[in-house]
Amino acid sequence: MSTNMREMLEAGVHFGHQTRFWDPKMAPYIFGHRNRIHIINLEKSLPMFQEAMKFAKQLTANRGTILMVGTKRTARETVAAEAQRAGIPYVDQRWLGGMLTNFKTVKTSIKRLKEMKAQQEAGLDSISKKEQLTFKREIEKLEKDIGGIQDMTALPDAIFVIDVGFHKIAILEAKKLGIPLIGVVDTNHSPLGIDYVIPGNDDSSKAVALYARGIADAVIEGRASAMDDVVKAVSAEGSDEFVEVENAAA
């Protein structure tokens, strides 16, 4: 879960957007500018990223679920891979309006997808070729739209968003429901309303990979921590029982 300044530099986390596009609310996190490009202060970004990872780890250790969101072309593949590695839900293609605020309807679509997948595994020989084609097109669309959240049985306990400006609808829905937000915020967007701000480049594929990997690692560590606690609790109970039996025999 550790990330250092050198890794951030190599990933280009410090490169912001052109100065003319900046959001003044990001001023506290900007070091300066070079060739009309804002330079993000990594001495601010690093501890804030570490704080976000710490939150992700603690949330997961307490059985919480984090939804990872990154639908830009530079983020899709990485988001899907890292979320799958960490075993958490994700959105990598497009954010459907109401994905959170109308989750009841989304759950109906998830149920439909699972039923269709089961039907596909059982075989489609009983329906015509034309019906098979229609069936496959529907299942492909559902996989694309909600495939990453098909195992999400309830609203997430937090959302990690790469590029808050690109995912405004997701941000608004999370705020409306009071779901904590971890967000990568570049110099051209406002950090207001984001609970755990990560000031940084939101376009570089290397930077995106660093953020996604860090949060995924935090989730994995949090889950391992929770498992350790369970093992310790079970071991302690077993130890107590053993002592009682031994004393009784004496």
From Swiss-Prot:
Keyword Lyase on entry: no
Any GO BP: translation
Gene Ontology, cellular component aspect: cytosolic small ribosomal subunit
Keyword Ribonucleoprotein listed: yes
InterPro entries for the chain: Ribosomal_uS2, Ribosomal_uS2_bac/mit/plastid, Ribosomal_uS2_CS, Ribosomal_uS2_flav_dom_sf
Keyword line: Ribonucleoprotein, Ribosomal protein
Similarity comment: Belongs to the universal ribosomal protein uS2 family.
Name under which the protein is recorded: Small ribosomal subunit protein uS2
Phylogenetic lineage: Bacteria, Pseudomonadati, Pseudomonadota, Betaproteobacteria, Burkholderiales
Designated gene of the protein: rpsB
